[in-house]
Regions:
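Single-stranded nucleic acid-binding surfaces, predominantly the OB-fold ssDNA-binding core
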Residues: 1-209
């Protein structure tokens, strides 16, 4: 996965522990948002790039997405730092740095799908899914929802609430064609299996032609 562009938004309060919120767009058209570049805590060296965290009802904490390797995390961190440096130099609060120009996004390759299926009852959420993209980015908290009107199965990406109080925004976003590939992968897995042991692939998606 190559980083195509990075956007940073600096807080007006320069004393904040948050240096910037950040989002990254990759060459497969996937955009991850709601990351925070934090000032180092006491005893730490260097700024910290934090991916969003979800607190579940059971008391556990989960990341809607996270890099699959220290190397990819470092690449993400470096891109955010470079973009912030240019924003500071330009004296602007909202800044986007373009790393590569992409005429057409390529299709991502999905692998290591993990699906947990819930009992078939009145609750609309029927399963939760995690999947790895291009071997470098793990996407979590993807829900399979059974809609009633009209009757359909929906593959819903995780959301967070904006501070402005507007409708929830997605933690990561897809282009239309890759989302269709993800939808097919997830729904095929949902109807094939009841539950999959941790870290066991259900299906490796081939790159669509």
């Amino acid at each position: 996965m190559k980083i195509v562009e990075c956007r940073v938004i600096r807080p007006k309060d320069r004393s904040s522990v948050v240096l910037a919120t950040a989002e990254l767009l990759f060459d497969n058209g996937i955009r991850v948002v709601n990351m925070h570049l934090l000032k180092p805590r006491e005893g730490q060296e260097g700024n910290q790039l934090r991916t969003p965290v979800v607190h579940t009802k059971s008391g556990t904490t989960l990341n809607p997405f996270n890099p699959s390797s220290p190397e990819f995390r470092a690449a993400m961190h470096k891109a955010v730092e470079e973009t912030l440096a240019e924003a500071v130099e330009a004296q602007v609060n909202d800044y986007t740095k373009v790393f590569e120009t992409v005429e057409e996004f390529r299709m991502p390759v999905f692998s290591r799908l993990k699906l947990h299926k819930f009992p078939d009852n009145h609750i609309p959420v029927k399963a939760m899914v995690s999947v790895t993209v291009d071997g470098e980015l793990r996407l979590n908290r993807i829900a399979v929802i059974k809609a009633v009107d009209p009757p359909a199965y929906v593959v819903q990406l995780p959301t967070y609430t904006l501070q402005s109080g507007r409708r929830p925004a997605r933690d990561f976003r897809f282009q239309a064609e890759p989302y269709e590939a993800l939808y097919k992968l997830v729904t095929d897995a949902y109807f094939k299996v009841a539950e999959v042991a941790e870290d066991v692939p259900v299906q490796d998606a081939e790159e669509p032609a």
